A protein has these predicted regions:
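Residue-level recognition of alpha-helix termini/interfacial anchor residues
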Residues: 3-4, 196
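Sec-dependent N-terminal signal peptides of Gram-positive bacterial secreted proteins and lipoproteins
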Residues: 4-26
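Extracytoplasmic cell-surface/polysaccharide-interacting catalytic and binding patches
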Residues: 26-128, 132-274
């Protein structure tokens, strides 16, 4: 330690004589001080990743929970739950019962309902968070009624967007007592949602022109919260959530191939429970 301090003192004196580094205030012989406090001395922080993240959205815009993907290829575990749940107090469709959504999503949905009402439309919440066990029961019941055929109307357990706590079914007043089908898209309320939901951080999870990708029938009532920046990007580029993740994964692959820090992106990579 003494030898190190002698070398440091010599270096500082040399720098002072050369006019490169102004001498700090008098320092007691045994006083410890931080080199980074001395003008002209740069200490590299090993935690800083010098590699640039090359994607339209910054890493700070990408919340791993909010962009969580749930489908047949990317199954959620039977124990997966949103980080927080809020009991919904919005206008509900008859028979909907008690409903919950992930807390940030719940707040955003309340704002969307208010925006719709301001535009002259009254919306009803029909379905929200759904646990794995509940989804399993619904899926098996659908198979029984359909002679064992998966017709794309009810997701298999682990593949349901509702399990994320970020997916919800929102219907117009004229449909609050009816069975849901794609004809609902023609209502002014659903047209308003399709045009404006991104402003509140939502996207139409299962668009009409993406059924071959999502493998789910068109659901104009199914909103999915992803956050405002991601929703705006998806809306502007005409994507479904699967296509968004395809683009995001390509950016992640390029970043890692160039030597990027895996710790910065590992939570954004989608994995399946099976």
């Amino acid at each position: 330690m003494k030898q190190w301090k002698k070398q440091l003192s010599a270096a500082l004196c040399a720098a002072l004589l050369l006019g490169c580094v102004p001498m700090p205030a008098l320092v007691e012989e045994n006083e410890e001080y931080d080199l980074s406090d001395i003008p002209g001395v740069i200490i590299e922080d090993p935690r800083i990743d010098p590699l640039e993240w090359n994607f339209a959205l910054s890493l700070s815009d990408l919340d791993p929970e909010l962009i969580k993907l749930a489908n047949k290829e990317c199954l959620l575990s039977s124990t997966y739950e949103p980080s927080s749940k809020t009991k919904m107090k919005l206008r509900a469709a008859p028979g909907a019962g008690t409903m919950y959504l992930q807390s940030e999503c719940a707040e955003a949905l309340a704002e969307l309902f208010a925006g719709a009402e301001e535009a002259g439309y009254k919306l009803y919440l029909k379905s929200a968070y759904r646990a794995y066990k509940t989804q399993k029961t619904m899926y098996n019941n659908r198979l029984e009624r359909n002679n064992g055929k998966d017709d794309g109307w009810v997701s298999k357990p682990g593949a349901s967007d509702h399990q994320t706590g970020l997916g919800c079914d929102v219907v117009p007043g004229s449909w609050k007592d009816k069975s849901m089908n794609s004809n609902m898209a023609s209502t002014p309320e659903c047209q308003w949602m399709a045009e404006h939901c991104y402003e509140y951080g939502f996207v139409i999870r299962y668009p009409e022109d993406k059924q071959d990708i999502t493998e789910i029938n068109y659901e104009p009532w199914h909103l999915r919260y992803v956050g405002k920046e991601v929703a705006r990007y998806i809306w502007r580029n005409g994507l479904c959530l699967e296509e968004f993740h395809e683009q995001l994964q390509a950016a992640i692959d390029a970043y890692l191939a160039a030597g990027g820090d895996a710790r910065r992106v590992e939570n954004l990579i989608q994995t399946s429970a099976e």
